[in-house]
Amino acid sequence: MEPNSSGSGKAAVGDGGGGGAPMLQPAPAPAPMPSANAPPPFLVKTYDMVDDPSTDKIVSWSPTNNSFVVWDPPEFAKDLLPKYFKHNNFSSFVRQLNTYGFRKVDPDRWEFANEGFLRGQKHLLKSISRRKPAHGHAQQQQQPHGHAQQQMQPPGHSASVGACVEVGKFGLEEEVERLKRDKNVLMQELVRLRQQQQSTDNQLQGMVQRLQGMELRQQQMMSFLAKAVNSPGFLAQFVQQQNESNKRIAEGSKKRRIKQDIESQDPSVTPADGQIVKYQPGINEAAKAMLRELSKLDSSPRLENFSNSPESFLIGDGSPQSNASSGRVSGVTLQEVPPTSGKPLLNTASAIAGQSLLPATSEMQSSHLGTCSEIINNQLSNIIPLVGGEDLHPGSLSASDMIMPELSQLQGILPENNTDVIGCDSFMDTIAVEGKMGLDIGSLSPGADIDWQSGLLDEIQEFPSVGDPFWEKFLQSPSSPDAAMDDDISNTSETKPQINGWDKTQNMEHLTEQMGATNIKQQKHMI
């Protein structure tokens, strides 16, 4: 039994050996245990794989050269793991690293480090030892069986989960921290989105309220229009009010235009608004009216005074209006003589005025008499500012009111020629043999600015004719006309007392003597 059994047993062994020859050939003998001086084969293979420059795109050393980084885990599991470890399970590779004390440096990438795993120092791999399992030998017996099962799993199945688990405690903590950071980021994003949602809800509520208000106003408007359409009287009243307002506007504009026209045409019309506007004429019309009134008031009393008094005609040297010399018979005031050769003028405080009569011919016309009267008025008005600045009416001056200056003052005024004193060049020509005087009628034509009043000319008394005793005595007198005039002036001044503070009689006599001497000198000079 035993040989058969033994033979059968050998045959079985032989059969078994023949059948299992391919499985026993790769490992004819058990792998020798690594000695204490030799590094583990896993670490050696891992070092060679990381140190290979051709695989830097997949796995390489870190910039600090104290760790390595798996840049592309899928390619690493597909190409490198089968080449070096005869499997393609990335989680199994991470678990092996965990058993040798590797730790994950960066939670965001697959970077592992160990104190004995440094670039260029391969001899330090001997210092890395494998950790003993916590469950003892039973776990070691189950480990090959579990390893075989993991090899049977499809590649990439629960690789990330397995990696997190197999990395160990350090890997889990890093993963938890990363998840916490991700959670915080997500929470911040969620808060921001909720705030946006809240603001959007508020805007939406505001829009809804506005839409509701618009709908309400639209409904009210529609109801109002419906009532208006159903009420014809309301529409008629509305149209009437519109027409009245338009008419009122038109009437207002018309009234304003009519108001301006009325004010421009008739100043006495009261404006429509009840205000009384006083008419104010233009300055030209007012000035013209004032000049007319002044001419009427000033001319009448002067002519009356001259007509009432036969001795009211005064002899003076009035400056002519033209250069033509003619014999004019006119009574004018003896006023200041204009300077002809640089001689001093008469002082304003001692203006002289004398009165006397001059002959007048029957050939004078009413227009000529008017001319003489106007000349009298003009020259009497010119003497007013010379008599002390007082407000004296020219027509009220008489012989008793006139002030005669001293001879010393007249000597500075009277020229050497006798004819200049009485203004012969301006008023009188040489007397003819028959005792008649020629009168230049053309020179007595009134100016354009003088207004003549024919009514006043009738009131003037007739002048003495040539045949009167006065003129005969005047013409037959052996003395010159100037001397006769001086005598007449002296007689007049003696008969009429003067009340002006001077000794009139002595002054007039002295004046007569001086003027007579002056006339004699002038006659001798002329001869």
UniProtKB/Swiss-Prot annotation:
Pfam families attached to this UniProt entry: HSF_DNA-bind
Cited PROSITE patterns: HSF_DOMAIN
Pro residues composition-biased segments: 25-37
PTM annotation: Exhibits temperature-dependent phosphorylation.
Coiled-coil residue windows: none
Bias kind Low complexity: ranges: 1-13, 136-157
Residue numbers spanned by region Disordered: 1-37, 130-160, 243-275, 300-343, 476-501
Recorded superkingdom: Eukaryota
Biased composition (Polar residues): 319-328, 491-501
Keywords: Activator, DNA-binding, Nucleus, Phosphoprotein, Stress response, Transcription, Transcription regulation
Subcellular location, principal: nucleus
SMART domains: HSF
Sequence similarity: Belongs to the HSF family.
Subunit-structure text: Homotrimer.
Summary of the function given for this chain in its UniProt record: DNA-binding protein that specifically binds heat shock promoter elements (HSE) and activates transcription.
Name recorded for this polypeptide: Heat shock factor protein HSF8
Species this chain originates from: Solanum peruvianum
Lineage, broadest ranks: Eukaryota, Viridiplantae, Streptophyta, Embryophyta, Tracheophyta
UniProt gene name: HSF8
